[in-house]
Amino acid sequence: MNSESQPTIITLMGPTASGKTALAMALAEQHNCEIISVDSALIYRDMDIGSAKPTQEELSRAPHRLIDIRDPSESYSAADFRSDAIANIEAILAAGKTPLLVGGTMLYFKALLEGLSPLPSADEAIRAEIAKEVEAKGWQALHDELRQIDPVSADRIHPNDPQRLSRAIEVYRISGKSLTELTQVKAEALPYKVVQFGIAPKDRKVLHLAIAERFKLMLNQGFVEEVQRLKARADLHLDLPSMRCVGYRQVWQYLDGEYDYDTMVEKSIVATRQLAKRQLTWLRGWADLNWLESGDESNLARLLEHCR
């Protein structure tokens, strides 16, 4: 099918605290769009403040799909996201609207737009083996091993990203092939015309300031109390993907007495900066991206121009 005759979907991706949500809501209100969230933290219920989830007032103005769809005790994979996103895209198109996919979870965007290769299922024995090695040698040693077998993934996965680092090693030990080799397989192209936007400030200092200000606002809004409520649940712990979300882990460890309040604030802001850096690294290698500068008053007009 010619791309001009295909239905259009819009993606708006960017690092945390770059202004994606406000811009997406403005576009949704002017362009008959409906928003699909592309965020691995916003999927969880009862994780509102630390995930910067849109408020009820904002959601009433511009509803978001794929928010509050999982309990924090549950898992949710990139494959789950791809399936859910496609189902919601089809529902939005059937209603005569344009799907607007907004977020900063680049793995979800990649899964949707490029498809997923059949990776091996988790192997608990190998995971336990990796955990023992980490306990003995540390994460940097595991990252050094990854660099030997898969330098491309090693460049992309930070030593302080335990979930993705251990998974990359696990995949290799199960299959004998690197994550990069296995993900070369491309799925059939989506039957949509995809118009892609990235948003970020030109000056990284501006982003760092926004990250710090937003985290302090979260604390004023009751973020510590939110984590206390989650921590009180017997079924939640720090090994769950939900509790590994940036900010939640650091506040949890503060509540465990691992460090004082000021250290928690500093660690949370640094971890959020590291997340933003990884997001920007993904985006710099993204093809066919129309760049917008955070806070530019012409952004909405540029979006509307591309979307007509």
From Swiss-Prot:
Molecular function in Gene Ontology: ATP binding; tRNA dimethylallyltransferase activity
Cofactor: Mg(2+)
Gene Ontology process terms (BP): tRNA modification
Region (Interaction with substrate tRNA) residue spans: 39-42, 163-167, 244-249
InterPro entries hit by this protein: Dimethylallyltransferase, IPT, P-loop_NTPase
Top-level enzyme category: transferase
Keywords linked to the UniProt accession: ATP-binding, Magnesium, Nucleotide-binding, Transferase, tRNA processing
EC annotation from Swiss-Prot or TrEMBL: 2.5.1.75
Residues binding ATP: 14-21
NCBIfam families: miaA
Record-linked HAMAP family: IPP_trans (MF_00185)
Subunit annotation: Monomer.
Name this protein carries in UniProt: tRNA dimethylallyltransferase
Species the sequence originates in: Shewanella loihica (strain ATCC BAA-1088 / PV-4)
